[in-house]
């Protein structure tokens, strides 16, 4: 999918947590309704068959419960995308990435292999650490191959790992430095790799021989291998579609660093100038180049400059999940899955405890027809109504975001205090209360946006009886 990823190491985050976040964006001209569910062991397939390819395989008989954000309609497969399992291990899959003809000539893509549709279902229920996730997915890639190029994130309380596929059967992975964040648009990202450091770097068993055989290392010294040069792309399209997204995230999180939005040398990871919050993650994943000539809603720039770069906060985002694994918390509340549906400049992030058996209907009952009884379609309506007069509605959108996220933090604090006091807490009930609150606030926002948008219609006339 045409997504955007940000990863935040535990020493770079405000609360010592690991954070994995990604927007899932549909292809241009397409919109994919999403829902959030809990997949229990009895609902996990024991023999898996893909819809997009002829791939199939037997799965272990001991899956864990996990959250999932599948396609609501299911006609094209599962596409589980993001989740947390009962061991508080997360997976976000996938970020579609680029490759090059040298790689594809040496290791062609495999039409019968796995893809984004399959990966979370095949891996997340069976792993107890982020590193295990890398190794399980890597083994499947080596055995069955893949028909597309993808980046995948795994995290637990201690670590975040990022895996990128190389051709049909190869892969490479790097552990995110604890004091750094990673920005990854739809482009091969890893720019440094150490074959002699398996604590922080992993890859398919024959990768070094593969590189040597097909002359893929483009560095002069061969002392500091750059996977992005070897396996990635430097296309004109990347300068408009991909690199500007990494640039704008890094500009917000490292304003002291001067960089070119079209540069192919943007670092995969950076140490931020201050610690990163959930709100920061929401902000960068909502970016449309605010206060710049590239902003499609802005007063600066020209009609050409406003369309030159692809915004992160695009119209066709299906869902966004922030997988937030917090340290020094009781295991049942350590993992939080913050969820949003629809276009990011118009929505909010809602926190849910993941060690539950069900998800509130407002987030789980997305259907094909447009409706206001679920979060997905209500957010889609708000975005479509507010877009033509974004600046008029911006204050209402900002207030909604701040108030709902404040309520989310308050809920998390209250539940933790209750548990520390020895009280019993029903986490499904707490999720439901949060959902009910957000449903009310979102309906109020829709009412306001519709009223204002109606008064701004082209056929309005100021004189009345």
Curated annotation (Swiss-Prot):
Name a GO molecular-function annotation: dipeptidase activity
Which residue ranges does UniProt annotate as crossing the membrane?
none
Q: Does the keyword Protease apply?
A: yes
Q: Which reaction does it catalyse?
A: an L-aminoacyl-L-amino acid + H2O = 2 an L-alpha-amino acid
- Give the record's keywords alphabetically: Dipeptidase, Hydrolase, Protease
NCBIfam families per the UniProt record, alphabetical = C69_fam_dipept
Q: What is this protein called?
A: Probable dipeptidase A
**Species of origin:** Streptococcus pyogenes serotype M6 (strain ATCC BAA-946 / MGAS10394)
Lineage runs:
Bacteria, Bacillati, Bacillota, Bacilli, Lactobacillales
């Amino acid at each position: 999918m045409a997504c955007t990823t940000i990863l935040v190491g535990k020493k770079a985050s405000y609360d010592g947590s690991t954070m994995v976040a990604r927007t899932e964006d549909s292809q241009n001209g397409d919109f994919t309704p999403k829902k959030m569910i809990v997949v229990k062991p009895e609902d996990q397939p024991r023999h898996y068959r893909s819809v997009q390819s002829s791939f199939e395989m037997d799965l272990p008989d001991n899956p864990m419960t996990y959250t999932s954000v599948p396609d609501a309609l299911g006609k094209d497969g599962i596409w589980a995308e993001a989740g947390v399992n009962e061991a508080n291990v997360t997976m976000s899959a996938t970020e579609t990435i680029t490759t090059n003809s040298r790689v594809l000539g040496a290791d062609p893509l495999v039409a019968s292999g796995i893809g984004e549709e399959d990966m979370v279902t095949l891996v997340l229920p069976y792993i107890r650490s982020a590193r295990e996730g890398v190794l399980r997915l890597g083994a499947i890639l080596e055995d069955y191959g893949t028909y597309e190029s993808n980046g995948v994130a795994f995290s637990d309380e201690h670590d975040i790992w990022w895996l990128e596929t190389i051709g049909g059967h190869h892969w490479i992975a790097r552990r995110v430095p604890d004091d750094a964040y990673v920005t990854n648009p739809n482009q091969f990202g890893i720019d440094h790799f150490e074959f002699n450091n398996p604590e922080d770097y992993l890859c398919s068993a024959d990768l070094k021989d593969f590189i040597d055989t097909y002359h893929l290392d483009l560095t002069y010294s061969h002392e500091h291998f750059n996977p992005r040069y070897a396996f990635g792309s430097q296309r004109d399209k990347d300068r408009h579609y991909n690199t500007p997204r990494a640039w704008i995230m890094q500009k917000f999180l490292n304003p002291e660093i001067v960089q070119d939005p079209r540069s192919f040398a943007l670092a995969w990871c950076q140490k931020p100038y201050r610690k990163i919050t959930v709100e920061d993650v929401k902000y960068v994943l909502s970016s449309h180049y605010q206060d710049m000539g590239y902003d499609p809603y802005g007063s600066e720039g020209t009609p050409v400059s406003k369309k030159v770069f692809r915004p992160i906060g695009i119209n066709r985002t299906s869902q966004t999940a922030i997988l937030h694994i917090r340290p020094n918390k009781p295991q049942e509340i350590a993992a939080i899955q913050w969820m949003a549906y629809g276009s990011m400049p118009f929505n909010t992030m809602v926190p849910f405890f993941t060690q539950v058996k069900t998800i509130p209907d407002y987030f789980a009952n997305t259907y094909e027809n447009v409706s206001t009884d679920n979060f997905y379609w209500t957010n889609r309506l708000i975005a479509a109504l507010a877009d033509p007069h974004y600046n008029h509605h911006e204050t209402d959108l900002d207030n909604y975001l701040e108030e709902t996220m404040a309520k989310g933090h308050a809920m998390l604090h209250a539940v933790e205090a209750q548990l520390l006091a020895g009280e019993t807490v029903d986490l499904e009930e707490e999720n439901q209360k949060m959902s009910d609150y957000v449903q009310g606030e979102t309906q109020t926002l829709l009412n306001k946006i519709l009223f204002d948008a109606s008064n701004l219609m082209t056929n309005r006339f100021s004189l009345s009886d």
